[in-house]
A protein has these predicted regions:
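Conserved G/P- and acidic residue-centered "switch" motifs that form tight phosphate/ATP-binding loops
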Residues: 190
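Small/polar glycine-rich anion-binding or flexible loop at a beta-alpha turn
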Residues: 297, 345-353
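Active-site adenylate/phosphate-handling loop in enzymes that bind or generate adenylated species
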Residues: 131-136, 174-180, 253-336, 386-401
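A short alpha-helix-loop-beta-strand transition element characteristic
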Residues: 337-345
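RNA-binding accessory domains that recognize and position tRNA/RNA substrates
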Residues: 2-184, 194-242, 311, 359-364, ...
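A conserved beta-strand->alpha-helix junction
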Residues: 230-258, 348
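Generic beta-strand/beta-sheet core signal
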Residues: 167, 210-212, 247-250, 291-292, ...
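General small-molecule cofactor/ligand-binding pocket signal
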Residues: 145, 245-247, 318
């Protein structure tokens, strides 16, 4: 439904935040800050007021209601929102507002719901509905359908005002980004890791991004693809800025070509990724590593491989898509608009160096044996000091950090 009528308030429901008890104020504070960050362009056209179970975005310019809705519904931390008219608490005024809505949208059927948040109001919700419904029916040609109405009108009576609104708009849900700490996402540029980043942020964790490149074997187009993915993901955060760290892995990649058993090459490479990620996570105050690994999807993602790779990571490794099948991951990627970018034909450093027959059931002792004559510790030290570029994502801009 297009909302062409001028409304003066957007009512935002907290959803999952209502279960957070003593932490509730922290959750709502972060949500409010994230919404304000995303609405910077419209900061002079609205006022935001917080109540116990709702946020009220009061529109100083009703013409910006649709762009504000499009932004707020994609900020993690709310369950739904509604465009509302704010009116006085007398029943005649409420009925007139509802009649105006019915006359404007001209639905064949409607349903009326009443919620009395202010329990001191002299009538119950049922009594209010019994008085409002006949007034609406007398002034319009609409019919009542309580099961499948074309238009649902909700009336919410609060302490100072009444809010009359139509149709709840489902929002993205989750928890506000920033409430669950900070993690480091290993972003390959494929389909899975952007989905893993999205799901992690949906649980309230702010993230930094880590990408491994092997120039000249990986192209500048491959890096631009990763930058585009990060910008798309940043759209959901509500954070002012996020950062993408690009590690030049070429020196270590060439060292790994000296592994005696080539079938262990990907296993050892991923162990090196995790070692570097842990060092950088500590440097950037991240409490977890996040990957797009999906159990059994490729040779390096069998449970045996995951176990061998995990042993080098002191930090917990979160794998949000571990038990998703490929079609489920693709469905989410399409929903969050990362899929078409992820399938662009630019290879990452893993795909370029996959051996013909990668080991699917590696052993820790054998992995350690393959590493023992490599100069990986010295090379990682050089990488950390010299071979990392950082890009800042700020709204629609991305630029290299000086």
């Amino acid at each position: 439904m297009e909302y062409k009528m001028n409304f003066d308030v957007i009512l935002v429901r907290y959803g999952e935040l209502t279960t957070k008890g003593k932490n509730r104020n922290d959750f709502t504070r972060v949500l409010v800050n994230n919404i304000k960050n995303k609405l910077r362009e419209y900061e002079k056209q609205y006022q935001l007021k917080k109540e116990f179970d709702r946020l009220f975005i009061e529109l100083l310019d009703p013409t910006v209601s649709q762009p504000i809705i499009n932004i707020v519904k994609n900020v993690f931390g709310s369950s739904s929102l509604s465009l509302a008219k704010r009116v006085d608490r007398d029943l005649t005024t409420i009925a007139n507002c509802a009649i105006t809505l019915v006359q404007y949208y001209q639905p064949d059927t409607f349903k009326l719901e009443v919620r009395r948040s202010d329990k001191t109001f002299p009538l119950t919700s049922t009594e209010i509905k019994q008085q409002l419904a006949p007034k609406i029916l007398q002034q319009t040609n609409v019919k009542v359908d309580v099961h499948h109405p074309v238009l649902q009108i909700d009336v919410e009576i609060r302490h100072q005002f009444t809010y009359v609104f139509i149709n709840k708009i489902k929002t993205i849900g989750g928890l506000p980004v920033g409430i669950s700490g900070r993690g480091l996402v290993m972003l390959s540029g494929g389909i899975d890791s952007p989905v893993a980043a999205f799901l992690t942020m949906k649980r309230g964790m702010n993230v930094e991004y880590l990408h491994f490149a092997t120039p000249p074997h990986t192209s500048e187009e491959a890096l631009e693809k990763v930058k585009t993915l990060v910008q798309k993901l940043h759209h959901y955060t509500g954070q002012n800025q996020q950062r993408l760290h690009v590690v030049n892995f070429s020196m270590l990649q060439h060292e790994l070509m000296h592994i005696p058993d080539a079938s262990y090459r990907i296993t050892i490479m991923r162990r090196m990724f995790y070692r570097i990620a842990n060092i950088l996570a500590a440097k950037w105050n991240c409490q977890a590593i996040i990957t797009g690994e999906s159990l059994g999807q490729v040779a390096s993602q069998t449970i045996e491989s995951i176990n061998v790779i995990n042993t080098v990571s002191p930090l917990p490794v979160l794998r949000p898509v571990l038990c998703f099948d490929k079609n489920e991951i693709i469905a989410i990627a399409k929903e969050i608009d990362t899929y078409q970018t992820s399938i662009l034909p630019f290879e990452d450093c893993c795909s370029l160096f996959v051996p013909k027959n990668p080991v699917t059931k590696p052993r820790i002792a054998q992995a350690e044996f393959q590493e023992q004559n490599l100069m990986w510790q010295e090379i990682i030290d050089v990488i950390i000091r010299k071979n990392i570029k950082t890009y800042v994502i700020d709204r629609d801009e991305i630029y290299e950090e000086s």
